């Protein structure tokens, strides 16, 4: 959760001088150790926002240019920094683009391990988003609840690959490690307790009258607006658009798994409001739990340690490829061009947070200042996805 810090710019007016009704507020930036480095320059008329202009770039580290200076395999650890809240997805996007470029086939067991690791990461990312959003509008208890479940997930992923935040788990052609003995049973046992906890989470916050009043009918994004502005993931589905790359592109082993695609329905307000965007993520956690159960059962149909495909002796591809996956924040695409060298000629990421930030700016005018934090939290932007 970002700590909200305001500084007031009164345009250099002397104390007691007559002023117009507009006030400029600087919201942020925040320290890099918090959940994102964001700054908004906000103009207000009393408590009503006239405009909120995002100032991006505080976490820019030229990661795409770094991708053009590393070998194809050597760039994998850097992809963890594209979205450090859910790092598995950028791992998979880069690996998938390189595999497409080089014609590498990934073993089925490795594909299942990718799905399992990514769906765990999706739940962990949504737990942060849901807990932080509740905290931002004044509900304290849900945040430690959400962090507790994320800690269980971090423990599982640490057992799987040795890291808790930046994983470097996926490899071009597969994954780095098979799951340890007994690991699948631990995850299933956790799922047995996680699903009832999500029911309690609904009772505690999702269906809480005060919480609903803070979010329902706030910052409504229609389906047409969402598509026109290029929103993806839960932000697009929150506007009632049923679009999920796990279904539409049917990549990896997702066609073998059964799950639903939750969308906003305007249950307590209008389709596409802040509550819909919140609750789509709640329902996605339940769907990810379904996917995990199926994947953990089906993975045993494939031989152990068959986790890395046949790689070319030299990774010096010539051509270009684009691969996209459904990350926790939506469509994450990776475009790579090879020119026969050990390094990519061009590496490019397409992420969901950049367009979400543009929509935050568009939807801010007319809101109360107190609702801006809810709007930002409902889009679940993460700074390094914007600053690439």
Curated annotation (Swiss-Prot):
Alphabetized InterPro entries for the sequence: NADH_Q_OxRdtase_suD, NDH1_su_D/H, NiFe-Hase_large
Assigned EC number: 7.1.1.-
Topology of the protein relative to the lipid bilayer: Peripheral membrane protein
UniProt GO cellular component terms: plasma membrane
4Fe-4S found in the keyword field: no
Family membership noted in the UniProt record: Belongs to the complex I 49 kDa subunit family.
Pfam families per UniProt: Complex1_49kDa
Species, as recorded: Sorangium cellulosum (strain So ce56) (Polyangium cellulosum (strain So ce56))
Annotated function: NDH-1 shuttles electrons from NADH, via FMN and iron-sulfur (Fe-S) centers, to quinones in the respiratory chain. The immediate electron acceptor for the enzyme in this species is believed to be ubiquinone. Couples the redox reaction to proton translocation (for every two electrons transferred, four hydrogen ions are translocated across the cytoplasmic membrane), and thus conserves the redox energy in a proton gradient.
UniProt keyword list: Cell inner membrane, Cell membrane, Membrane, NAD, Quinone, Translocase, Transport, Ubiquinone
Gene3D superfamilies assigned to the protein according to its UniProt record, in alphabetical order: Cytochrome-c3 Hydrogenase, chain B
Compartment(s) of residence: Cell inner membrane
Protein name (record): NADH-quinone oxidoreductase subunit D 2
Family annotation (HAMAP family): NDH1_NuoD (MF_01358)
Record lineage: Bacteria, Pseudomonadati, Myxococcota, Polyangia, Polyangiales
UniProt subunit comment: NDH-1 is composed of 14 different subunits. Subunits NuoB, C, D, E, F, and G constitute the peripheral sector of the complex.
